[in-house]
Amino acid sequence: MYARFFALVSLFAFAMYLLVVSDNLLTLYIGWEIMGLCSYLLIGFWYGKESARKAGIKAFITTRIGDVFMLLGLAALYSLTGSLGFKEILSNHAVLDVLATSVSPVFGLSWAGLIGLLLFIGTVGKSAQFPLHVWLPDAMEGPTPVSAMIHAATMVSAGVYMVIRFFPLISAGWVPGEALTPTMSVMAFIGAFTALFAATIAMAQNDVKRVLAYSTISQLGYMVAALGIGAYTAAAFHLATHAFFKALLFLGSGSVIHGMEHGLMHTGETLDPQD
C-alpha cells in the first residue's frame, strides 16, 4: 500500500515538473495527461470503497472532456504555425499578428481567439471551473496528502499555469485599455461566476474537506477572472500564494480528522470527525 502510494505521488509530482519545465506544447500535454492518470489512481486509492472508485472515475472522465478540446487546439495551432514550441510561437510577433488577424470558420473568431478558447476549455476541466467543476469536491475521497497536492501544487494549478504561459496567444490582438477579445471575455465571465457560486456553495457545507474544496474552486475562479481582464501578473501571484495556505489547510484538516477518530475510539460518541 505504501509503495503504491509513494510511487503514484512521485509520478504525480514528476508530471507537474514536466509540465512546468517543458518548452513546447507537446511535452506540456504529456505531463498534463500523466497528471490526469495519477489523479484517477490517487483519488480512487482506497479502491475497496465504492465512493472512492466512483470519485476517481468521475475526475478522470470530467477532465478528459476538457482535454479533448485542448488537443483540438494543439492540432489547430500546429497546422497553422508548423510548430508547438513556445519560443517559435509566443516570442514571434509576426506569427501572433497573423493568428490574430486571420478569421476562423467558428463564430467569426480569429484563429488566435479560437485556439485560445480551445486551450482554455482544457483549463476549465483541469482547474475545475464551471461547468466542469463537479469532480473536485468528490476528489476528497483520496488520502489527505493527495488532496493537498491536487489543490495546491499540481492538477488544478496546471490549468491556470498553462493559461498564464500562453497569455500572449490568448490575448493576441488585444490592446490594454480597450475592449476585451471574445476569448478573454469568456474567461472573465466564467472565472467571476465560478468564484461567486463556489464560495456560496462552500457556506452550506458541513464537511471540512468539502468546504476547502469549494474554496479552492472559488480561488481558481478569481485567478481565471484576473487572466480574463488581462491581469496575468496578479493571477500568477495569487496562484503562488494560494498554494501555501491551501496545502497547510488540507494537511491541518487531515490531522484534525485523524486526531478526532482516535478520540472517538475512547469516548464511543457517534460524531463524524469530518463534520
What are these language model-derived features?
Residues 1-275:
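...captures the hydrophobic TM-helix bundle architecture rather than a specific catalytic motif
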